[in-house]
């Protein structure tokens, strides 16, 4: 590698340029994940009509701190619900009364539970559980100051960081954050620690 000495003005310009890039990168992480592009609609919108109100509901007016212990308990309880695929999207009330659900129903119910308990920055995600899967899968991602957590009540009983996953797993296609809709433009960076505004 060749190193060329920089004059004092160039060093200052170089340092300022790096600082500006760092600041811009830091502020953009508070908007939405860089791998998601806002869209007006998704191919799932019509199918999701029964659960649209759940996704656009406000968080509990008195924000409470959602503990990882509580999340693990919710995941364990939802994981225990027998899996049964449904072509129809079930509301949280339907999942609770039927006591069977697919990944969509379990993830929507967890989304509703988290919002009712004051959690913000929660995304409902549709994508692939594994890159080779033929069918899509649904899960949640929760952005916190400690990092982004992956919440999958179909397969997991504990909270895990997105950054801990193999890039060939949990590949997002579309995401829903409140009334906002996103399309994934490329695979999630493995180092993502993003706080979305909601």
Where are these regions (language model features)?
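A structural boundary/capping signal
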Residues: 2, 6, 25, 29-198
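Bacterial N-terminal signal peptides that target proteins for export
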Residues: 4-20
């Amino acid at each position: 590698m060749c190193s060329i000495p920089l004059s004092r003005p160039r060093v200052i310009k170089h340092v300022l340029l790096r600082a500006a890039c760092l600041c811009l990168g830091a502020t953009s992480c508070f908007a939405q994940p860089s791998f998601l592009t806002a869209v007006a609609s998704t191919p799932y919108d019509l199918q999701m009509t029964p659960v649209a109100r759940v996704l656009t509901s406000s968080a509990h007016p008195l924000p409470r701190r959602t503990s990882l212990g509580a999340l693990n308990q919710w995941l364990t309880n939802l994981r225990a619900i027998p899996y049964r695929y449904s072509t129809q999207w079930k509301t949280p009330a339907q999942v609770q009364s039927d006591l069977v659900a697919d990944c969509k129903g379990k993830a929507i119910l967890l989304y509703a539970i988290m919002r009712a308990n004051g959690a913000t920055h929660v995304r409902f995600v549709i994508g692939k559980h594994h890159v080779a899967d033929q069918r899509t899968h649904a899960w949640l991602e929760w952005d916190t100051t400690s990092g982004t957590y992956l919440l999958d009540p179909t397969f997991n009983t504990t909270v895990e960081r997105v950054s801990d996953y193999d890039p060939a797993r949990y590949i997002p296609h579309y995401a829903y954050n409140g009334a906002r809709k996103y399309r994934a433009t490329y695979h999630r960076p493995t180092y993502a620690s993003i706080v979305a505004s909601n």
